[in-house]
Regions:
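Acidic, glycine-rich flexible loop/linker segments
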Residues: 61, 321, 335-337, 342, ...
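Alpha-helix C-terminal capping segments
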Residues: 29-33, 207-210, 405, 421-429, ...
Length: 792
C-alpha cells in the first residue's frame, strides 16, 4: 500500500526491521506454510518507519530519550513515574494524517474482504527487536482483542505505540543491553478467531521443563487465549510425541485436566470489548479440545518448527463456530533451546517430615528458599527484597522488574505456559504456579522452601529446609563397558532423566503409575455400578475428562507407560507389570472390598500369582490393553514386558498363556517377555525358567530378603540386609551364567548396584549385560565402571 502499511501476506522474516518479529513471522507463515496446512488469520501491519515518523511528527524523540537517560530502572517508583509520563505524551499526540488515513483504509479493505460490516480484529504490538532468539520481548507491549470499527482500531494502534514505554519494556531493554532508540514498534491488525466460544492456548515444540526435543507441549482452556498467556487459569495440558505423530499414529503421551475456572469471551456491553466469566461447571470437568485437535495443532507446530529450524513458542486459537484451528503467533523458544546439555544440574531436598503448606505445577527442577513476600498489587512490589519468595495471585509483565529479585515465585493461578512460568525459566528460579490458595495459606514474612525437584508437582514447605545442589559434567563421557540403564518410577521425571546418558530404562514399575496417576482399584472401576456412594464420588472426581471408568484406567496406564517409553526411545524400556501387595491394593480407592487380609503380604498374593487368579483376571486384562495400546497403536515397540514374582515353572507358563490371550504374544512385533529373577527358585531353576521367558532382570531386593530369610521392611533385622552376602552372590552368579549360556538377556534392576558400586563392578566381571540404576547414580557408576574396564 505505502510505507505506513503492509499486508501480512506480503511480509517475510526478512521484513523484521520493518514490522518487528511478530508481524514478520505471521507473514512468513502465511506466505510459506499455508500450503502445508498451517492456518494463520490475515491482516495488516503498521511499519516501524510509520512509528518513527509518528515520534518525529510530534517532536517526542528528545523528550523521551532525555527522560530515560538518567532513569534508574531498579528504583520501581521512579520507573513507574517515568513510564506513565512518557505513555501520556504518546497517547496525547495525534497520529500523522497519512498514517491515520492508511490504517482506516486498510481496515475498510479487510472488512470488505471478510463479509462486510465492522469485523473484529486483534491489535498487537510487534517490536523491531522482538522475538529474536536472544530476546524474549513477548507480552511486554499491549494486545487488544475484539476491536471493532475504524475509530477504535486507530485508537488502539496509538495505545500499542505507547506500550513501547511500559515499565517492564523499559526495564527489559536496560537489563538486556538494548538501546531505547534502537527499538521501534509495529502494530499488527489481525482478524479475530471466534475462540470466545471455542478454546485457545499456547504450545511449545519441546518440553518446557527438561528441554526434551521429541515432544510438543500443548496448553488449552475455554475462551480467548489471554487467560492462558496471563496465567489467570489453570489450563489443560497435553504432551504429544513427535516421532509417533510423524508416523501418523495416535501420539498423545499424557493429558492433564486443568480447572479452567474462568474464561474470557466477547462482551456485548457497549464500550466493553471482552469480559471474563466463570466457566460453566459442566465444562470444567471436560477437556477443552479433543484429541484430534491436539494432534492437528501438533502437526501444524511441527511444520512451523521445521520451517524455522528451531524450537518454537506458538499461540493458537480454535474458532468455536467453524471448529477450525488457527495459529495466531509463533516465535523462537528462548530458554531451553539455548541451554547446553553438557552439564546437568540436580537439586535434592531433605524434606523428611517437613510440613507442606501448598502445592501446584512445578516450573523447572530447582529449589529456592527465603522469606515469603505476599504481593497483592503493584503497590506492594517495593517490599520484595533480593532473595525473597514472591507470592501472588498471578503475575503480568508489569511485575518483571521485581521478579528478578526473587529466589522463587509462587502463584495461585496459571499453568506452565503462563507469564510467571516463562519469566521464572528465563531467570532460572523455581516457580510453583496454579497453587490455588498460596496467598491465603502463606503468611507475609514466613520462611519457606519452594521445591520443583520432585516431578510435575511443586511443593511449598514450612521453614528453610536443607537441600543439595550438584552439577554433573557430561562432556567427553567414555564408552560404557556394559549397558547402563535407569530405574524410573515417575513418568513426570522421565523427560528430565532421559537427558542423562543411558541405554534405556531397566525398570519401570506399573504399580507406581497406578498409585500416583490412577489411585483406584481396577476392580472398583470394572464394577463401577456396585460401589458405595462415597466411593463413587471419589472415583468420579478422578476420572473427569476420560469418559467411562475402564477407559480412564487403560488410558492413564498407557499415558504413563508411553511417557516412559518415549523418553529414551529407541532404547529399550522394560515395564514391570503391577506388583502391588494385597495391603497396597487395599489402600486404593474402592480396594478394601477386593483384597484379602494377609499376615505377610510381602510373600503373599502378588505378582504372577495375581495374573492367573480368577479374582484378578479382568483387572490384569486392562494392564495388557494399556501395553498393547502403547506398542501397537502408538508404535513404541522398544517396550518390553516383565513379569514379577514368578514362583514356579507352571505359573510362568500360565502367565505366558494369559498374556497371549490378551494380545501380547511373545515374539510378535518384536515383543520380549522377561521375568524378574527375584526368588531363589528362579536362580536355582534358571535354565528351566529361561526356556519360558526371553531373559532375566534380577530383582536383588526380594532375592536378598528371601535368600537370607528376613523382612526388608523390619527395622530389627535391617542391618542383616546386604546384597553382597555370599549366598546372594552365588545365586546372582548362577542366574547370569545360565542366561549367558542360552544367549538370553540378563540385567539387574534392584537397589544393590546403586547403593554399592563394588557390587556393580562384580556384576560386570560376572558378565551381566546391563545394570539399571537410580538416575542420581548413573554418571558416577558409568565413569567408575569405564575406568575399571580401561585398567583391565
Amino acid at each position: 500500500m505505502n510505507e505506513n502499511i503492509l499486508w501480512l501476506h506480503e511480509l517475510r522474516l526478512a521484513d523484521l526491521a520493518r514490522v518487528g518479529g511478530k508481524n514478520s513471522s505471521l507473514g512468513e507463515m502465511i506466505g510459506n506454510l499455508a500450503g502445508l496446512g498451517v492456518s494463520v488469520p490475515g491482516g495488516y501491519a503498521t511499519t516501524a518507519e510509520a512509528f518513527k515518523d509518528f515520534i518525529a511528527h510530534n517532536d517526542l524523540s528528545k523528550r523521551i530519550f532525555d527522560r530515560l537517560a538518567t532513569l534508574d530502572v531498579e528504583d520501581v517508583n521512579a520507573l513507574t513515574l517515568a513510564g506513565k509520563e512518557i505513555r501520556g505524551w504518546v497517547i496525547d499526540a495525534p497520529l500523522q494524517p497519512d498514517l491515520d488515513r492508511d490504517i482506516r483504509s486498510a481496515y475498510a479493505q479487510l472488512c470488505a474482504e471478510n463479509g462486510g460490516g465492522d469485523v473484529a480484529v486483534a491489535v498487537r504490538s510487534s517490536a523491531t527487536a522482538e522475538d529474536l532468539p536472544d530476546a524474549s520481548f513477548a507480552g511486554q507491549q499491549e494486545t487488544f482483542l475484539n476491536v471493532t470499527g475504524a475509530d477504535d482500531v486507530v485508537h488502539k494502534v496509538k495505545e500499542v505505540f505507547a506500550s513501547l514505554y511500559n515499565d517492564r519494556a523499559i526495564a527489559y531493554r536496560v537489563h538486556h543491553g538494548f538501546k531505547h532508540e534502537d527499538v521501534f514498534l509495529s502494530a499488527g491488525v489481525q482478524l479475530m478467531v471466534r475462540s470466545g466460544v471455542g478454546a485457545a492456548g499456547v504450545l511449545f515444540t519441546l518440553d518446557t521443563e527438561s528441554g526434551f526435543r521429541d515432544v510438543v507441549f500443548v496448553t488449552s482452556s475455554f475462551g480467548l487465549g489471554e487467560m492462558v498467556v496471563q496465567g489467570a487459569v489453570n489450563p489443560d495440558e497435553f504432551y504429544v510425541y513427535k516421532p509417533t505423530l510423524t508416523a501418523g499414529k495416535p501420539a498423545i503421551l499424557r493429558r492433564s485436566l486443568g480447572s479452567k475456572a474462568i474464561r474470557m469471551v466477547y462482551s456485548d456491553v457497549p464500550g466493553e470489548r471482552v469480559r471474563t466469566e466463570d466457566t460453566p461447571v459442566e465444562l470444567r470437568s471436560t477437556f477443552s479440545i479433543s484429541d484430534e485437535d491436539v494432534q492437528e495443532l501438533s502437526k501444524q507446530a511441527l511444520v512451523i518448527e521445521k520451517h524455522y529450524g528451531r524450537p518454537m513458542d506458538i499461540e493458537w486459537a480454535k474458532d468455536g463456530v467453524s471448529g477450525k484451528l488457527f495459529i495466531v503467533q509463533a516465535r523462537p523458544e528462548t530458554v531451553k533451546s539455548r541451554s547446553h546439555a553438557t552439564q546437568i544440574e540436580r537439586f535434592a531436598l531433605e524434606a523428611k517430615g517437613a510440613k507442606i503448606l501448598a502445592e501446584g505445577r512445578a516450573v523447572g527442577a530447582k529449589i529456592g528458599s527465603g522469606v515469603a513476600r505476599v504481593v497483592r498489587s503493584l503497590d506492594d512490589m517495593n517490599r520484595v527484597q533480593a532473595g525473597d519468595v514472591l507470592i501472588a495471585d498471578m503475575t503480568d509483565p508489569d511485575w518483571e522488574p521485581v521478579m528478578k529479585r526473587a529466589s522463587a515465585i509462587v502463584t495461585n493461578l496459571g499453568g506452565r505456559t503462563c507469564h510467571a512460568a516463562i519469566i521464572a525459566r528465563e531467570l532460572g528460579v523455581p516457580a510453583v504456579v496454579g497453587s490455588g490458595n498460596a496467598t491465603d495459606v502463606l503468611s507475609d514474612g514466613q520462611e519457606v522452601t519452594v521445591s520443583c525437584a520432585e516431578g510435575d508437582t511443586g511443593f511449598i514447605y514450612d521453614g528453610l529446609l536443607p537441600f543439595e545442589r550438584t552439577t554433573t559434567d557430561l562432556g567427553n563421557m567414555p564408552p560404557a563397558p556394559l549397558k547402563i540403564m535407569m530405574n524410573v518410577a515417575n513418568p513426570e521425571r522421565a523427560f528430565d532423566f532421559g537427558q542423562l546418558p543411558n541405554a534405556g530404562i531397566g525398570l519401570a514399575r506399573l504399580e507406581m503409575i497406578i498409585a500416583a496417576h490412577i489411585g483406584i482399584h481396577p476392580n472398583a472401576l470394572l464394577e463401577y455400578d456396585k460401589q458405595d456412594a462415597d466411593v463413587l464420588k471419589k472415583i468420579d472426581a478422578k476420572i473427569a475428562g476420560y469418559g467411562d471408568p475402564v477407559s480412564f484406567y487403560v488410558n492413564r496406564l498407557a499415558e504413563g507407560i508411553a511417557t516412559l517409553t518415549a523418553s529414551v526411545a529407541p532404547n529399550t524400556v522394560i515395564v514391570r507389570l503391577s506388583d502391588f501387595k494385597s495391603n497396597e491394593y487395599a489402600n486404593l480407592i474402592g480396594g478394601s472390598r477386593y483384597e484379602p487380609h494377609e499376615e505377610n503380604p510381602m510373600i503373599g498374593f502378588r505378582g504372577a500369582s495375581r495374573y492367573v487368579d480368577p479374582s484378578f483376571t479382568k483387572a490384569f486384562a486392562l494392564e495388557c490393553k494399556a501395553v498393547l495400546k502403547v506398542r501397537n497403536e502408538m508404535g513404541l515397540d522398544n517396550l518390553w514386558v516383565m513379569i514379577p514374582f514368578v514362583r514356579t515353572l507352571e505359573e510362568g507358563r500360565k502367565v505366558i498363556e494369559v498374556l497371549e490371550q490378551n494380545g501380547l504374544k511373545q515374539g510378535e512385533n518384536g515383543l520380549k517377555i522377561i521375568m524378574m529373577c527375584e526368588l531363589p527358585s528362579n536362580a536355582l531353576l534358571a535354565d528351566e525358567f529361561l526356556e519360558i521367558f526371553d531373559g532375566f532382570s534380577i530383582g536383588s531386593n526380594d532375592l536378598t530378603q528371601l535368600t537370607l530369610g528376613l523382612d526388608r521392611d523390619s527395622s530389627i533385622v535391617a542391618h542383616l540386609f546386604d546384597e553382597r552376602n555370599p549366598a546372594v552372590k552365588k545365586l546372582l552368579s548362577m542366574a547370569i551364567k545360565s542366561a549367558r549360556a542360552k544367549g538370553k538377556y540378563v540385567g539387574i534392576c534392584g537397589q544393590g548396584p546403586s547403593d554399592h558400586p563394588e557390587l556393580a563392578e562384580w556384576l560386570m566381571q560376572e558378565g551381566i549385560e546391563s545394570v539399571s540404576l537410580n538416575p542420581d547414580t548413573v554418571v558416577d557408576t558409568w565413569l567408575r565402571l569405564a575406568k575399571l574396564k580401561s585398567e583391565g
